[in-house]
Amino acid sequence: MTNIRYLTGFSGSDAVLLVSPEGVTFVTDGRYAEQSRREVRGAEIVISDRKWSEVLRRIRLSTRRRRPGRAARIGFESRHLSVELYRLLTRGNAGDWVAIADPVEALRMRKEEAEVRAMEGAAVAASGALLEVLSAGLRGRTEKEVAADLERGMKLQGAEEPSFRAIVASGPRSALPHAEPTGSGIGRDEGVVIDFGARRRGYCSDETVSVIPARPSPPLRRMFDAVRRAQERGIRAVRAGVLCREVDTRVRESLDRSGYLKYFVHSTGHGVGLDIHERPSLSQRSRDRLAEGMVVTVEPGVYIPGFGGVRIEDMIRVTAGRGDRVTYLPKQDPLLV
């Protein structure tokens, strides 16, 4: 549904969009009749309690208008159509059905000013909530309590909802990049990784801080400094025209010099927008090139099993000459509790 929201403005959860030479048709059922009239732009709205029958009928009408003797070509989003629906649509329906991967996702990579402003608003709400949680203290509280307060605080700060379930991982559990918050209490001398984000006007923020004790152990402090340097190196590489994998390379080179590369187990970053994970990917597998208007994360991390982890993440807007932060919490020094 994200692509339909991007193209039409519809924020509901069930609809089909048909694009043909005759025009754009938005098909949904009666549950969304009023919502679609309020939100949908640039499309004819069709309300039908037999949605897929209506879609089939309109596809057949459109294909009959093609020149005689020439089969119609019907493109569909292959990532978003189940095998069952594909069989339903193609059964007895003449034409060449063409699977198209990511036709809209490619358009969504470059953000307009209004989209960036929405993400900035989401980041402000998320960061404001985090600062309130930190001011109340973490020690002695459980990871679940901190995550719940953080997500509740985002809404009080003006967010529609969290953009994903917050990660709060303390002590040795912070070595799990996607740890689920547990009922474990946060110890006095433990580091805590907090990965969090909010949603405003449909758009997401994504940010990670590593909170360490006021007097951290030397190994934990070295880890933090290594990740901070790697992130700064990655951010300096972000600018229009640079291959995405080049940003990942810069981060890996920095961690390699610090001796932590083998503990970096994921890619450097990803695009953010209406979805929390979008193209492009800042990884060695990516063939994309950064372009003005993209918003990506730069989020190196070091994860040592049995000891703990550190991750630092910001959202960066790509411009011609540099990358500008969309998230605003400072990362040069650790957040100390």
Task: For each feature predicted by the language model, list its residue ranges.
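Active-site neighborhoods and metal-handling regions in enzymes and metal-associated proteins
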Residues: 1-337
